[in-house]
Amino acid sequence: MRILGIESSCDETAAAVVQDGRQVLSNVIATSLEEHKLYGGVVPEIASRRHAESISGVVRQALADANCDMSGIDAIAVTYAPGLIGALLVGVNFAKGLSMATNTPLVPVHHLRSHVAANYITGDLQPPFLCLVVSGGHSHIVAVEDYTTYKVLGKTRDDAAGEALDKAGRTLGLPYPGGISIDKIAPTGDENAFAFPHPWLDTPYDFSFSGLKTAVINIVHRMEQKGETLPVADLAASFQKGVTDCLVEKLEKAATDYGYTSIALAGGVSANSRLRRETDRLCRQKGWQLHLPALKYCGDNGAMVGAQGYYEYVSGVRAQPDLNAYATMPIDRPTF
């Protein structure tokens, strides 16, 4: 079964053809990242305009790369939530039009579910398992009970891990995206040079990163006021350690308490080298099995949408003609 996956939740316009939820036949991405760099972050208006300009060509290229046309597609899967509402609407409306024009079933896909599904593409992972989903907008610990059933065990109370890393990178004067820049420079610094706070929370699996973000801002401002040279690499390494240690500690507690031995990472921050290394160390120590998405599938892409779309489709999920886009949507809410 071939699924055409369409993704437009942020600044990547992406489409892919995926067979049986596991085999990627094509994967095409057009990004407006370079434009957003000029502003130090994603500008929703620019993202939406670039989606509108690119989506038709991206879908055509994905079909061509897979050596098929719409007659060879069994269903169209499209990201409908969460994300930038204007960006999402471009993908949803394009997919709805294509579905009606070709009489092809349409399947709505939750963005975070598709990030989880990136692991299905690159390995033999099957539910049940515990997944740490970390991105610029979300930080969740999710029990994946089957391919379409999820239970959120913990989530961030404030900033997401990716957001905190990006803002710290910007504070340190590093190029956008800040999280990627921190990951690149951190190996040249001393990760024990600065101690960043680990917040106490009354819920055992939740996260809070606003305190870490405030701490690095205060350190930078204090040193600048004194005219001191910023030890950028040390600050980057220490901040990255603070964020990733918090993520791994909460993941370990949730896995231990709930008895999970199959662990996965997902989302853009799952590409972070220290997070991957420390999670691997934890799983080796505990004798758990770790599943990591390939780096090319960590960021937003159409292949992960096609993968999750397959499992939603075979479970009977179909979009109604009035399918809309939503800026927010819990991952554990049933899909229609």
Provide a role label for each language-model segment.
Residues M1, P108-L130, Q308:
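Conserved phosphate-binding catalytic cores of ATP/NTP-utilizing and phosphoryl-transfer enzymes
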Residues H115, P293-I331:
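Glycine-rich phosphate-binding/hydrolytic loop that grips phosphoryl groups
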